Each structure stands twice: as C-alpha cells, then as structure tokens.
Amino acid sequence: MNSLRSVKRLLGARSLSSDGLSESVNSSDREDSLSFQTPSTPSEDEMPQCFEDLIKPQVLSSEASKSLLSLNEGIKMEIVSSLQQKDQKKRNKLIAWMRKKPCYEQPDDFISYIVNTKIDSIDESIIHKLALLLRNEQVIWVEKFIHNGGFGVVFCTIDKISRLEWREELHDSILEQLLLCVKAMCTVQRGLECLSQSTYNVERLISLLLSKKQPCDFVVREVLVQIVHSFYKAHLDKEEGAMQVFSLFSIKDDKDEEVEFLKNVRVDRPFRRWIIELEDVSRNVFWVWNHDSNVIDLEKQYNQVYEAPLGFIGGIETEATSYVAAHIHLINELLEGLPLEKRQRKRLELQLSGLERIMGLRFRKSSQKFHKKLHEALREWIVAAKIDDWPYKLVQTGST
C-alpha cells in the first residue's frame, strides 16, 4: 500500500501541475472545457494505453518506467481512477471560484471595492483593470468615476500605503497601479480640475518621491513626476503654478532656531533635497556616464522616438535616464512659466543646489545614441539659458 501511495503522489503531483490552473484561467470562455463531468473509468481494454499515456509526460528513468508498466492491472486502474477524480475535483473548485469572483464594470463597483477592502487584501488585478478602464473608456465613464468620489478614494489609498512603516512588494505593486489611475484621470478636464485643487495630495506625493520610502522602480517614480507635471499644467496662471511647484520641492527649514552667525554664513540651497534625488540616480547607474567628450548640440533636434537595439529595451539604464529627463523637462517648463526676474532667481537657486553641476558632469556624459530623451531635455535647458543670457557652457561641454 505504501508503494501504491508513492506512485499516486509521484504521478499526481507531476500530471496535475502540468494541466491544472494554467489551462483554465480565462474565466467564462473556458468553463465549457472545465464542465462538471463525472470522471469515466477506462475499461480493461483501454487501461494499458491510458496508463502509458500517463507515464509518457513524466521525467522518469527507463528502469522506473518499466517498473510502473509491470504493475498489476488492478493497481493501474486504481491509480488512473484516483488521479482522474483528483483532477476533476480541482477543476470543479476552480469553476466554483470563477463563478463566485465578482465582476467589476461600473465606476461605483471599483469605488466600493477600494473603500471596503483592507490594503493588505486589495487585489492588484482589479486596480490594474481600473487603471486600464480610466485610460481607455469614454470620457463620461471617467468623469462619473471622479464625480462619485473616485479621485479622493484613490488619493486616500495612496496616502495610506505611503504611510506604512514597512511596505511589501504587493503594496508597491498596488501603489504603482493607483498612481497610473491618477495619471489616467488627469487626461480629462474634470481630473485636472480636481488635481489643481489637491495641493496637499501633491505635496504628499512629492514627499514620498524625495523620502527614504520612495518606490524602488524608476518607472513608478517617473509616474510621480508626471503627476506633478500635470498639476502644474492644470493651473491657468502658469506663474502661480510654477511658484507653487517650486515651493513644494523646496526644503522648509526652521530658520528661527538657527544661531545668528550661522544665518550670515549660510548659503541658501532650497532645492538641495531635490538635487540629491538626481545624484542618487547617477550613483545607482554610474556606468552610464562614461562619454566624457560629449557636447550638447544646440542645433540638433534629438529624435526621442527611435528603435533601440536589443539589450537597451526596458533596461535599468533607459528607465533611469528617462526618469531624470522627466525631472529636467519639468524644471524647463516651470522656468518657462515665470517672468525673467523670477526665472533668473530660480536658476540661481537651482545652481546653488547643484543642478547645473550634475547636468554637466554626469547627465551630459550619457550616450547620445541610446539616451536621446535625456539629451533633448538638456538641449532645451541650454537653449532657454542662452536666450536669457545665463551661463550654460558647464552643462553643454562640462567645463566653464
């Protein structure tokens, strides 16, 4: 009997793993193939062939195969019948689970699910489906989701996840999908209006981006920057929007607690925390900045849409430089929205914080062939600086 159990365990584990859940994941389209049929026990004439078919897929030595084939016919029939019953039970459970799983289609369904589900129990696939619907559905569907409170619910959940002391991989995955939901909602006017009135929420996102709890993936961090960019674009008064974003990125020190002589010698670097984030990226992918002789061509338009060679598709280098480019594009647009006097003041503050140094001594050295998006952002900065008579040679050539 012990040998019989061993054979069942061996064949059952291997055969069921090969055709278990993987063949029946496609919900209602596959229910017909997983019908509740009573397992039919093979006849004595069919038994040898049926048992051989069961043995063939297994990775067994020739001696083990011969030993199994030499078993008594009664034992063979019992093994096959037992495995068929186990397989049918597994299929029945799967179909029952598929029928019980709720179908989320309407905006209120998703809002109710997010509100009534604990963070640890949220299904990432449902939030992913919501992000896809917000991006691809009609405008009226997205506006209904926002009108019914979806915008606030999504931001509230993001805030809860960002406040967790220890975030797991599941939390980061859900956070990414929720951020994509916010990004998708910003494609409609109603979403931009809500975002422009959500200064506190945007401040929380920036704090998350520049904190030690920031998402690990550069792609997720880039989505955060894009949401901040949308927050700026949502302002009708570009000067007011630019100053507000700059204030959110600046360091808020309590200067009243400083000693008087320290105030006199202290150099104000309001965006130092922002630039440190870019410096950390340059250290994490240090091997990218190895083209010392690069010079940014002001006349050349770097085509950002190109076919990258194999090995540079979706690599960490591409993600890192794309993330850095998103920051520089944001800075360029913020500066463009300010009058000349305020723009020069912000340029000086960014320079003292270390932006120009890292652009000229690090980002300029990335490959012009493989990281065109970053070089286009640098070119835009240099062209704007040249128009304003601001020194730009350090960024263009790496030397003054």
UniProtKB/Swiss-Prot annotation:
Domain GBD/FH3: 39-400
Protein localization: Cytoplasm
GO biological process: actin cytoskeleton organization
InterPro entries according to UniProt: Actin_filament_regulator (IPR051661), ARM-like (IPR011989), ARM-type_fold (IPR016024), GTPase-bd (IPR010473)
Keyword Cytoplasm recorded: yes
Disulfide bridge map: none
Gene Ontology molecular function terms on file: actin binding; small GTPase binding
Cellular component terms (Gene Ontology): cell division site; cell tip; cytosol
Residue intervals passing through the bilayer: none
Primary location: cytoplasm
Residue ranges with Polar residues bias: 16-27
Alphabetic keyword roster: Cytoplasm
Residues covered by region (Disordered): 16-47
PANTHER family tied to this protein: PROTEIN BNI1
Protein name from the UniProt record: GTPase-binding protein rid1
UniProt organism field: Schizosaccharomyces pombe (strain 972 / ATCC 24843) (Fission yeast)
Phylogenetic classification of the source organism: Eukaryota, Fungi, Dikarya, Ascomycota, Taphrinomycotina
